[in-house]
Amino acid sequence: MSSKNQKADPLIQINNLKIEGFSDEQWHPIIKGVNLTLKRGQVMGLIGESGAGKSTLGLAAMGYTQPGCRITGGEILFEGDDLASLRDSEKQKFWGNRMTYVAQSAAASFNPAHRLIDQTTASAIRFKIKNETDAKKDAQRLYEALNLPNPESIGDRYPHQVSGGQLQRVMTAMAMSPRPDLIVFDEPTTALDVTTQVEVLTAMKNIVEEFNTAAIYITHDLAVVAQMADVIKVLRYGN
């Protein structure tokens, strides 16, 4: 199959997905029959108010359900495999490898006792995508592509030794290191000031385009999603 056709084919196909959450001693609908299609190299903006179910849906695209949630109907097709029907042990081969996640709080995602370079390369080495030497060279290239200062040495620092905007970009490098097919950005710039937010968004957009990675960008900010996304979906009351 040609690369052109591969890009045209859906990477993720979500069909009539229904998810419930448990609260007040009963199950409540969160996602109510959502349909989505995401192609390789495409950035989908997922926008909605707080509590609309954006993060639940974004994680579900990776086949992951948060504690207290359950899938009650529909399909999550990843290159034809229905993630909704797989056991967690079967989905482990995708998580942190072919699918990665960038959270809102970079600081909470890093181990303060480990150098940035070691955390950036961990998945690529663990899944045997690259050896340690090649993974570190690639991490430096990612740092440079993300406009981090001193890309050849910033990885020797610890999380507390860089700014919030820099740490957010290192987390993007960590997510890109295994060259995933899908990356989910969950409001990763919310805690940053406006100037830093623009810098980080630009760097994220450029690197996703460079590696032809499909992405879901979750936010409540229309201006942010307009800068990142090729297509925008609005989630409201689970629809």
Listing of model-derived features with the role each one plays in the protein:
Residues 47-49:
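The feature captures the beta-strand-to-loop junction immediately N-terminal to the Walker
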Residues 70-82:
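Conserved ABC transporter NBD signature motif
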Residues 177-181:
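A short, proline-enriched helix->beta-strand linker immediately N-terminal to the Walker B motif
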Residues 183-186:
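Catalytic Walker B motif of ABC-type/P-loop ATPase nucleotide-binding domains
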Residues 198-211:
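Helical segment within the ABC ATPase nucleotide-binding domain
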Residues 225-227:
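A short, surface-exposed alpha-helical micro-motif characterized by mixed small hydrophobic
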Residues 231:
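Short, glycine/charged-rich "phosphate-handling" switch motifs in NTP-dependent
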